[in-house]
Amino acid sequence: SSSAPLLFPLVSCDSSLPDETQVTLGCLARDFLPRPVTFSWKFKNSSSISSQNIYNFPEVFTGGKYMATSQVLLPSTAILQSTDDYITCHTKHTTGEKEKKVELQVTPELPPNVSIFVPPRNSFSGNHPRTSQLICQASGFSPRTIVMSWLQRGEPVQPSLVSTSAVEAEPKGSGPTTFRVISRLTITENEWLSQREFTCQALHKGLTFQKNVSSVCMGDDTSTGISVFLLPPTFANIFLTQSAQLTCLVTGLATYDSLDISWSRQNGEALQTHVNISESHPNSTFTAKGHASVCREEWESGEKFTCTVQHSDLPSPLKQSLSRPKDVANDPPSVFVLPPAQEQLKLRESASITCLVKDFSPPDVFVQWQHHGQPVDPKHYVTSNPTPEPQNPGLYFVHSILTVSEKDWSSGESFSCVVGHEALPLSVTEKAVDKTSGKPTLYNVSLVLSDTASTCY
């Protein structure tokens, strides 16, 4: 019995062909009997397409019926006039004639976005001359044909200094397919530091898109990226060591070879400064800290201390000063120690003892747990950050929860919450609790200070 062909359009899976001057379309006829089937093609305006551009393939017998394909290769300018352009596939068969529109998904013309990534100072390496790379990326463009080139001071660079990747399709969302390419230019450290101008050019659809860059663009104060932050001593540091540690934090360093951090007193006298430098961060910058210590009495007197940062990337030294804040409200904390809940003890697993520290100002406070007069490992307790009191935002509270075994608590072991704050008469208070008393007991604070206090000279 006879069977009419079913027609299906064939288009390229790639919305932008390697040779964008040519367009290939096809037509599939399947499930027909008997053979043969004859193909012909017409433009949208019904004029015939020359047989020189048509390639017909032999029928294939499969599943008891035949299928055949026809392909047409045309200059893109012949049909790419608008987004709704198409050509028509015609077939003749003993069962009659059929036709099928074959539409081309027209590749949109999108210009490239050109960006240049400059090398960080510490990226230059190798023997003399030390070299690094400028990286130019053209992205978001379509169609895919693009030509990348570099200029130095307006003149083309040597081709051997340039490496350009293959054009790649970008991850496709709901929009059209776009492309990306990366071009790298090898430069010497001297070329970069001499403030020469480099230009990356992208030639796309007859238009040139470019970006210029030089080290002079990076040389002003706001572009060095170097920032200085002063960290005052914590009460815990002052309480435990009877000295105040001053910290000068420097961020955004491209290199640290020329870095100098120094602390000085109000009268200009230099303080011994210890500098620690971090490992390189993911953005290829470094962080440094400059530490100096002064006596507790000197810090509490309100004396001003100054940190000075010098670096080859800075046009002039950066200076910032730090002193103990004046006219700060001093309110000593109230301390409450709460025994574990009975519901928790019934589980016979662990016991949570809570130390509630309330109504204090300023917010810097020190909380430590002790057992048999010795500090408990901090991994066994957690202390919250100071939080404003809901009914009095000028005052703060924290809570610290110590977790011990149910066995230790039930055996009558005593645990102490030690709280340090500058508004307390002796800077510290201690309250203990155990199963027997079931309520906190105030201890002599001198016992706590005897092992931790030190003398500042």
UniProtKB/Swiss-Prot annotation:
CH4: region residues: 327-457
Organism: Suncus murinus
Record InterPro entries: Ig-like_dom, Ig-like_dom_sf, Ig-like_fold, Ig/MHC_CS, Ig_C1-set, Immune_Resp_Modulators
Pfam families tied to this protein: C1-set
Cysteine-cysteine disulfides: 27-89, 136-200, 248-307, 355-417
Keywords in alphabetical order: Disulfide bond, Glycoprotein, Immunoglobulin domain
Spans annotated as CH2: 106-220
Cross-referenced Gene3D superfamilies: Immunoglobulins
Positions annotated as glycosylated: 45, 113, 212, 276, 283, 444
CH3: annotated segments: 221-326
Record's keyword annotation contains Glycoprotein: yes
Spans annotated as CH1: 1-105
Name of protein: Ig mu chain C region
